[in-house]
Amino acid sequence: MSNLKNFLFTSESVSEGHPDKVSDRISDMVVDSFLSGDPFSRVACETLTTTNKVVLAGEVRGPSIKEEDLIQKVRECIKDIGYDQDGFTWREATKIESHLHAQSADIAMGVDSSSNKDEGAGDQGIMFGYACNETEELMPAPIHYSHKILRLMAEDRKSGKLKNIEPDSKSQVTFEYVDGKPTKVKSVVISSQHSADVDQAKVRELLKPYLLKSIPEKFLKDFNEEELYINPTGNFVIGGPDGDCGLTGRKIIVDTYGGAAPHGGGAFSGKDPTKVDRSAAYAARYIAKNIVASNIAEKCLIQLAYAIGVSKPLSIYVDLFDNDLEKNKFVTEKISENFDLSPRGIREMLGLNKPIYEKTAAYGHFGRVPEANGSFSWEKTDKKDVFSK
């Protein structure tokens, strides 16, 4: 984020019913399906969703899964999200194709471990992790509250409490920063698909309460309601994959820090944990979050770089945003001493060879609560004492 002290900063989120997020979820369901049968499966699954059609394509190596079983799981994903519309439904009207095939032997050769070397990275690339003390979850405020608005809407929609609202929604929150700290909300945008029998006044009445439910009152003092934009273009009846084609991996900023930190360009969903696009980004967040949780820095940016077939990162970059070279050196040394950042080391450190990915596909991969089954293990702060001087 900018080194300016006083500024406006905006982040957006999209709901689980957004067409790209439908695709992300289906791709991560495929990852979980293979990892359930073999924790060392290899998966790279892309999903396209459009009007009454879903297409899976990619490379896999692992247990044999019947195509009809995978197709049934796709329908279960669509049903859970909430789609049962003329243009996109979990029922037979939506046609599902699978074009998954075996992983390239050339890629496997570079990644598999052998007797004389550790397993290499699945590809070259750069990955970033970030944390800051703007929220309890150590996430930037704009993306955190953008996610929260949509997550609460989805919970109420699925429970039946929020009626006439359909699965496809977007949010956007602008914060005013003073002396580098978020002080108040400047504007909020909520756009949501709705049933055809409600007008925009009713939609506003239904969705306005989620502003107060999601954002702490201290940030809403003197909020001008004219800056609350709900469905600013009017009717939003046709939505989801029927309104726009969805593809896996197109919401990488929503998935991470809302633009508050750099992104290496690699998407997460549809990839097993040997892919450092995913696992190393999780590790970088884990390190950054523990650094900030230790109170040695108010915010932290980590960059990792890898080469295909090489087990150790080519570089580790640390930015604590305070120009304290001695502290930066101390933190960098502690990372090298306490974190195995080889692909295998990351997977073992965070327990990533588990079917834990489908639930990451919506509302952000970061700022979530670690669960007993290993989900969101990269959000733990169990290494914060490593960075205490």
Swiss-Prot record:
<feature type="binding site" description="in other chain">
    <location>
        <begin position="168"/>
        <end position="170"/>
    </location>
    <ligand>
        <name>ATP</name>
    </ligand>
</feature>
<dbReference type="InterPro" id="IPR022628">
    <property type="entry name" value="S-AdoMet_synt_N"/>
</dbReference>
<feature type="binding site" description="in other chain">
    <location>
        <position position="18"/>
    </location>
    <ligand>
        <name>ATP</name>
    </ligand>
</feature>
<dbReference type="GO" id="GO:0006556">
    <property type="term" value="P:S-adenosylmethionine biosynthetic process"/>
</dbReference>
<feature type="binding site" description="in other chain">
    <location>
        <begin position="250"/>
        <end position="251"/>
    </location>
    <ligand>
        <name>ATP</name>
    </ligand>
</feature>
<keyword id="KW-0547">Nucleotide-binding</keyword>
<dbReference type="InterPro" id="IPR022630">
    <property type="entry name" value="S-AdoMet_synt_C"/>
</dbReference>
<feature type="binding site">
    <location>
        <position position="244"/>
    </location>
    <ligand>
        <name>L-methionine</name>
    </ligand>
</feature>
<keyword id="KW-0963">Cytoplasm</keyword>
<comment type="function">
    <text>Catalyzes the formation of S-adenosylmethionine (AdoMet) from methionine and ATP. The overall synthetic reaction is composed of two sequential steps, AdoMet formation and the subsequent tripolyphosphate hydrolysis which occurs prior to release of AdoMet from the enzyme.</text>
</comment>
<dbReference type="GO" id="GO:0005737">
    <property type="term" value="C:cytoplasm"/>
</dbReference>
<dbReference type="Pfam" id="PF00438">
    <property type="entry name" value="S-AdoMet_synt_N"/>
</dbReference>
<feature type="binding site">
    <location>
        <position position="271"/>
    </location>
    <ligand>
        <name>ATP</name>
    </ligand>
</feature>
<dbReference type="InterPro" id="IPR022631">
    <property type="entry name" value="ADOMET_SYNTHASE_CS"/>
</dbReference>
<feature type="binding site" description="in other chain">
    <location>
        <position position="59"/>
    </location>
    <ligand>
        <name>L-methionine</name>
    </ligand>
</feature>
<dbReference type="InterPro" id="IPR022629">
    <property type="entry name" value="S-AdoMet_synt_central"/>
</dbReference>
<feature type="binding site">
    <location>
        <position position="267"/>
    </location>
    <ligand>
        <name>ATP</name>
    </ligand>
</feature>
<keyword id="KW-0554">One-carbon metabolism</keyword>
<comment type="subunit">
    <text>Homotetramer; dimer of dimers.</text>
</comment>
<dbReference type="Pfam" id="PF02772">
    <property type="entry name" value="S-AdoMet_synt_M"/>
</dbReference>
<dbReference type="Pfam" id="PF02773">
    <property type="entry name" value="S-AdoMet_synt_C"/>
</dbReference>
<dbReference type="InterPro" id="IPR002133">
    <property type="entry name" value="S-AdoMet_synthetase"/>
</dbReference>
<keyword id="KW-0067">ATP-binding</keyword>
<keyword id="KW-0479">Metal-binding</keyword>
<comment type="similarity">
    <text>Belongs to the AdoMet synthase family.</text>
</comment>
<feature type="binding site" description="in other chain">
    <location>
        <position position="103"/>
    </location>
    <ligand>
        <name>L-methionine</name>
    </ligand>
</feature>
<dbReference type="GO" id="GO:0005524">
    <property type="term" value="F:ATP binding"/>
</dbReference>
<feature type="binding site">
    <location>
        <position position="244"/>
    </location>
    <ligand>
        <name>ATP</name>
    </ligand>
</feature>
<dbReference type="GO" id="GO:0004478">
    <property type="term" value="F:methionine adenosyltransferase activity"/>
</dbReference>
<keyword id="KW-0808">Transferase</keyword>
<protein>
    <recommendedName>
        <fullName>S-adenosylmethionine synthase</fullName>
        <ecNumber>2.5.1.6</ecNumber>
    </recommendedName>
</protein>
<feature type="binding site">
    <location>
        <position position="20"/>
    </location>
    <ligand>
        <name>Mg(2+)</name>
    </ligand>
</feature>
<keyword id="KW-0630">Potassium</keyword>
<dbReference type="GO" id="GO:0006730">
    <property type="term" value="P:one-carbon metabolic process"/>
</dbReference>
<feature type="binding site" description="in other chain">
    <location>
        <position position="275"/>
    </location>
    <ligand>
        <name>L-methionine</name>
    </ligand>
</feature>
<keyword id="KW-0460">Magnesium</keyword>
<dbReference type="InterPro" id="IPR022636">
    <property type="entry name" value="S-AdoMet_synthetase_sfam"/>
</dbReference>
<feature type="region of interest" description="Flexible loop">
    <location>
        <begin position="103"/>
        <end position="113"/>
    </location>
</feature>
<dbReference type="GO" id="GO:0000287">
    <property type="term" value="F:magnesium ion binding"/>
</dbReference>
<comment type="pathway">
    <text>Amino-acid biosynthesis; S-adenosyl-L-methionine biosynthesis; S-adenosyl-L-methionine from L-methionine: step 1/1.</text>
</comment>
<feature type="binding site">
    <location>
        <position position="46"/>
    </location>
    <ligand>
        <name>K(+)</name>
    </ligand>
</feature>
